[in-house]
Curated annotation (Swiss-Prot):
Domain of life: Bacteria
Protein name as catalogued: RNA-binding protein KhpA
Originating species: Caldanaerobacter subterraneus subsp. tengcongensis (strain DSM 15242 / JCM 11007 / NBRC 100824 / MB4)
Subunit-structure text: Forms a complex with KhpB.
GO process annotations (BP): cell wall organization; peptidoglycan biosynthetic process; regulation of cell shape
Domain KH: 29-75
HAMAP family, alphabetized: KhpA
Gene name linked to the record: khpA
Subcellular location: Cytoplasm
The keyword Cytoplasm belongs to this UniProt entry's keyword annotation: yes
Upper taxonomic lineage: Bacteria, Bacillati, Bacillota, Clostridia, Thermoanaerobacterales
Homology family: Belongs to the KhpA RNA-binding protein family.
Keywords: Cell shape, Cell wall biogenesis/degradation, Chaperone, Cytoplasm, RNA-binding
Amino acid sequence: MGELVKTIAKALVDNPDAVEVNEIHGHQSIIIELKVAPEDMGKVIGKQGRIAQAIRTLVKAAALKEKKRVIVEII
């Protein structure tokens, strides 16, 4: 799922080399930390957080197959 977030984020930003994704696995959940360059933060979040919410929705749909809870944090 980290690769999914990374692919989406790289398509959105101007500086794709600065995109970093960290996965922290818990017992029933996965936390995905997405780090982008400060100047690209607005592009990943979007107006009123719509793009960030869309990314979270896609990742949650992918997580249903694994029966895990996924949290996407944009840092």
